[in-house]
């Protein structure tokens, strides 16, 4: 007889190889055909909701790993919440306005000047919608589930109308105003920028020290003294109208070889060193506070203009001279302090950053090129004390990567000052996973200036503002709501297709327009106002959603971006934050922590990972990251992830193979009748389940990744599944011992598949489809396992046993090295007490020790004379006695000797008898 045919070997159609790149699209097609998203919502429609509001990615370009990290974690969250019984809709969104799309069209050869604004905007819209289709397909390929057939898009008429109404409410509250202020201006984009659109890069700049003659000393300083200022923007000197000193700082008039200079005393040594003064030739002649210097008049170095000495709290002693060159047209602090002294705001540059006629001798020069001309003129006037060059961190346009300037222009602003404290209070009421997240957004709101919401572009939502014949601003509830209604019906392009009069309510009149003529604003809104209105345009308008959202989750750059603009508009109009909980993730770097770039050849993109390895590998990688900080990815890291995936898959496959003849309805053993080892594993499963559920609740996916591996490797592979082979393959099919183990194996398989489902979405579905007797059609329509109390006493007892078993394994390994045995079934374990542990008494509580140790024989004694002492006993390994059973390979002294049952142990004889 071929005894192999009598073994109950694992049977399953679940393949060992994942073949994910080919299999996943088939699973996704099945989900779409089955309308799984709709069914998941339907299942929980009467339950409490959980709303994760999607921050809209920009509809331009292919997905990068940051997109994948973001969308996959969102999918973890929403799928988990759904399996916990929450009504958890997920509405993906896209941000569609702004300069990058205008630039993309220009690169494609679209000439803006050859068409109307409305026609160009139509092309922008077509481009954005095509980009959305591409990104949508790629997001779905990552296994992300959501309402992709009905996403929110910031260019749709209903969204734009909601944005206009929100703007109108802010205007009603006096939070929208027009003013001439210095704002970040990008000559390369020819537009103003918000703080969120600024990034810092190193830039080489001129560093100059300039002397300003005293014109009117007011009897405080010598009339032949000079104030020294320091600046890295020589091109702003033509706009200088003041020198700012700190009222409480001490200043000195220093005589240096007959020249008299005024600087802050705390900076005198640094200035002396910078200007190369001989220390022995420096004399402090006079001392005064900054307050005493107020209203002294200096002379502009080359213009017929007074430079007034004023006081400002923003002056520091970190660098420079303590006498700050002040040009209100080119600096926020300068502007604010200038307002107090009613200083003129001079800003002689055009939109391209070129000097206008107001710039005098510099007319027609690009501001950066004017640096040399200004410096040369200062030198000619003997006002230049030092010219040097420094490399420093400087603001750049985040899209064009070109330097920006501060430039005073007429702009529209949303007031932060009026709602700042309310926003800070709302942040206090918001929950954060990490304290630094709260600190970060709190400090940004606390320190930010007024929000410039106007942009001098065409692809965006128009500012719904009209002007009367006399220049009066018209921005009333009636006019704004009328524009909103028009946008909702026709889209915002109507603003560029119709005259102002046609966009106003019928019969509208205004005292400032006696002839009934009106003009309309040509600026559009900052794109951060677009996405920052999503709580109104999406949460409050989609019937399946609600305000405020339970969670906003985006990259950490959104503390200054979407998180910031959203809470500003929500607090301004609704008096509360649009989110209850705020969570962020870091950026994706290469394997060495460097930024990915084509030049370094270290770029990995989602499409490549999905095609080569599969979306589940990308998702498992995401779960393996500490996403709160920057994360790393490389081919080597993905290879390690694939190895972990293979281990998980093979473990699930082993369990599937060994429950193929098990029906939980008819074959399950009641928990009280399970073998104790099986009850131990059931309790370990419950511990693992409770920990995993807790980790999902706290968004701790790295913990899940590590604990899944630990449970699979330590509890299952290294012990239970290995121990179980002797039972599952060898015992009689429906023996109590085998059914007891299958009962627990089935439970482990079901629960593990559910617990892995939010992460390994495709693999979990595949496992589910191969699992016999499951009730739900999809694992994603099932519920998470319930958290159940564990038997602490049982766990404590078996945890001690597992430690003892580790000692036995060490002894077996030693015996293997010494060639006493080969495989562990060739061993007889002799074990007894040591000085610290009563091994013999402890082991009396356990049956079938030879199976638990995976050896042929175990002898427990009080004392083992020739044993090696381990923590849990003295152990001696001998070769097993007797001969090897040809069916189970255990050694015994009771082999059968006749007929069919020859060379079988008594247990195998009993089993085979029933098969013959």
UniProtKB/Swiss-Prot annotation:
This protein's record includes keyword Cell membrane: no
Keywords for this protein: Aminoacyl-tRNA synthetase, ATP-binding, Cytoplasm, Ligase, Metal-binding, Nucleotide-binding, Protein biosynthesis, Zinc
Residues annotated as binding ATP: 598
Motif 'HIGH' region location, chain numbering: 57-67
Pfam families: Anticodon_1, tRNA-synt_1, zf-FPG_IleRS
Enzyme class per UniProt: ligase
InterPro entries: aa-tRNA-synth_I_CS, aa-tRNA-synth_Ia, Anticodon_Ile_BEm, Ile-tRNA-ligase, Ile-tRNA-ligase_type1, Ile-tRNA_ligase, M/V/L/I-tRNA-synth_anticd-bd, Rossmann-like_a/b/a_fold
Enzyme nomenclature, EC number: 6.1.1.5
Free-text remark on how the cofactor is bound: Binds 1 zinc ion per subunit.
Domain of life of the organism encoding this protein: Bacteria
Gene Ontology biological-process entries: isoleucyl-tRNA aminoacylation
Reaction it catalyzes: tRNA(Ile) + L-isoleucine + ATP = L-isoleucyl-tRNA(Ile) + AMP + diphosphate
Binding site for L-isoleucyl-5'-AMP: 554
Subunit structure: Monomer.
The family this protein is said to belong to: Belongs to the class-I aminoacyl-tRNA synthetase family. IleS type 1 subfamily.
Protein name (record): Isoleucine--tRNA ligase
Organism of derivation: Staphylococcus epidermidis (strain ATCC 12228 / FDA PCI 1200)
């Amino acid at each position: 007889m071929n005894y192999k045919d009598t073994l109950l070997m694992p049977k399953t159609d679940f393949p060992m190889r994942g073949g994910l790149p080919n299999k996943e699209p088939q699973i996704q097609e099945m989900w779409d055909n089955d309308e799984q998203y709709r069914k998941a919502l339907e299942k929980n429609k009467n339950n409490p909701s959980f709303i994760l509001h999607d921050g809209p990615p920009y509809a331009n370009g292919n997905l990068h790993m940051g997109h994948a990290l973001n969308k996959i974690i969102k999918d973890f969250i929403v799928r988990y919440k759904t399996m916990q019984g929450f009504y958890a809709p997920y509405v993906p969104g896209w941000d569609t306005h702004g300069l990058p799309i205008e630039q993309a069209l220009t690169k494609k050869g679209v000439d803006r000047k050859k068409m109307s604004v409305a026609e160009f905007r139509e092309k922008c819209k077509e481009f954005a919608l095509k980009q959305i289709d591409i990104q949508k397909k790629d997001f779905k390929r990552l296994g992300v589930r959501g309402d992709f057939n009905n996403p929110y898009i910031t260019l749709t008429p209903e969204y734009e109308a909601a944005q206009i109404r929100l703007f109108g409410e802010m205007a009603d509250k006096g939070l929208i105003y027009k003013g001439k202020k210095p704002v970040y201006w990008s000559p390369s984009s020819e537009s103003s920028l918000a703080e969120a659109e600024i990034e810092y890069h190193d830039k080489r700049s001129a560093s100059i020290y300039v002397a300003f003659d005293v014109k009117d000393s007011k009897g405080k300083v010598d009339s032949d003294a000079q104030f020294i200022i320091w600046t890295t923007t020589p091109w702003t000197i033509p706009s200088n109208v003041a020198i700012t000193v700190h009222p409480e700082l001490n200043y000195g008039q220093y005589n240096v070889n007959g020249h008299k200079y005024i600087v802050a005393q705390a900076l005198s040594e640094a200035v002396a060193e910078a200007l190369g003064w001989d220390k022995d030739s420096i004399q402090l002649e006079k001392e005064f506070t900054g307050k005493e210097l107020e209203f002294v008049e200096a002379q502009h170095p080359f213009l017929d203009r007074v430079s007034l000495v004023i006081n400002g709290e923003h002056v520091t002693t970190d660098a420079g001279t303590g006498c700050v060159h002040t040009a209100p047209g080119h600096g926020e602090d300068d502007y604010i302090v200038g307002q107090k002294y009613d200083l003129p705001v001079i800003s002689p540059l055009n939109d391209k950053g070129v000097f206008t006629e107001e710039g005098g001798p510099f007319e027609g020069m690009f501001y950066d090129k004017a640096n040399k001309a200004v410096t040369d003129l200062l030198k000619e006037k003997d006002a230049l004390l030092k010219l040097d060059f420094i490399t420093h961190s400087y603001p750049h346009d985040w899209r064009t990567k070109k330097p920006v300037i501060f430039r005073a222009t007429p702009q529209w602003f949303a007031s932060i000052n009026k709602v700042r404290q309310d926003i800070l209070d709302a942040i206090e009421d918001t929950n954060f996973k990490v304290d630094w997240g709260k600190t970060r957004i709190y400090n940004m709101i606390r320190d930010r200036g007024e929000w410039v919401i106007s942009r001098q572009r065409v692809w965006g939502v128009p500012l719904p503002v009209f002007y009367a014949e006399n220049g009066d601003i018209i921005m009333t509830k009636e006019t704004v709501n009328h524009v909103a209604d028009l946008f909702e019906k026709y889209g915002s392009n109507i603003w560029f297709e119709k005259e102002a009069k046609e966009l106003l309510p019928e019969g509208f009149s205004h005292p400032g327009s006696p002839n009934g003529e009106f003009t309309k604003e040509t600026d559009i809104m900052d794109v951060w106002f677009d996405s920052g209105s999503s709580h109104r345009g999406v949460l409050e308008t989609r019937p399946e959603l609600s305000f405020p959202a339970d969670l906003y989750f985006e990259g950490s750059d959104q503390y200054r971006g979407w998180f910031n603009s959203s809470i500003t508009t929500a607090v301004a109009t609704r008096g509360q934050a649009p989110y209850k909980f705020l969570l962020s993730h870091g950026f994706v770097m290469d394997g060495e922590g460097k930024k990915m770039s084509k030049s370094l050849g270290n770029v990995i993109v989602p499409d490549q990972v999905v095609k080569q390895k599969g979306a589940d590998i990308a998702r498992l990688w995401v779960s393996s990251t500490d996403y709160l900080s920057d994360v790393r990815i490389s081919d080597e890291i993905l290879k390690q992830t694939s190895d972990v995936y293979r281990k998980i898959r093979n473990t699930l496959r082993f369990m599937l193979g060994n429950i193929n003849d098990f029906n939980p309805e008819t074959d399950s053993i009641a928990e009280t009748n399970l073998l104790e080892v099986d009850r131990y594993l059931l309790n370990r499963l419950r511990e693992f389940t409770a920990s995993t559920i807790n980790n999902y609740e706290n968004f701790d996916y790295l913990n899940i990744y590590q604990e899944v591996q630990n449970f699979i490797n330590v509890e299952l592979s290294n012990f239970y599944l290995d121990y179980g082979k002797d039972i599952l393959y060898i015992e009689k099919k429906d023996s109590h011992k085998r059914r007891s183990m299958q009962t627990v194996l089935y439970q482990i398989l079901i629960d593990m598949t559910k617990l892995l489902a939010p992460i390994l979405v495709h693999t979990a579905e595949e496992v589910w489809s191969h699992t016999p007797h499951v009730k739900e059609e999809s694992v994603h329509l099932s519920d998470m396992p319930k958290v159940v109390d564990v038997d602490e006493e049982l766990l404590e007892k078996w945890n001690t046993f597992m430690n003892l078993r580790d000692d036995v394994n060490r002894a077996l390994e030693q015996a293997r090295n010494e060639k006493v045995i080969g495989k562990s079934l060739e061993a007889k374990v002799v074990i007894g007490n040591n000085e610290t542990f009563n091994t013999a008494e402890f082991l009396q509580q356990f049956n079938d020790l030879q199976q638990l140790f995976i050896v042929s024989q175990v002898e427990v004694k009080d004392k083992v004379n020739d044993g090696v002492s381990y923590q849990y006993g003295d152990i001696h390994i001998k070769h097993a006695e007797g001969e090897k059973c040809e069916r189970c390979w255990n050694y015994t002294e009771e082999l059968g000797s006749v007929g069919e049952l020859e060379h079988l142990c008594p247990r195998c004889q009993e089993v085979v008898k029933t098969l013959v």
